């Protein structure tokens, strides 16, 4: 991801390699659909950019490849900016009309219910509207 180079580790497909894979698949009538797991399964992005995590996770070690069930903070504008950049770049690479965003195994009770920023957003979103 060009705008966020810390997201790229030592083992990755180049954009040229992805183009070859997509072309190979298309020749066999297979559509390659990219997947970006959010808001869970995000240890790699949190290891690179820990400020995108919930407030209570600041002191938790984030090592790529480990499952620690941490999530991106839902009330952090920087999360949305980074993911817009990622989605824009991925969309340009893949001809598919679809991007799979995951959404599974997001353990809210261990993350958003303990995060001060997320709690603030939840309270604002659940305020009763006047009759």
Model-predicted regions and their roles:
Residues 1-131:
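Substrate-binding cleft of carbohydrate-active enzyme catalytic domains
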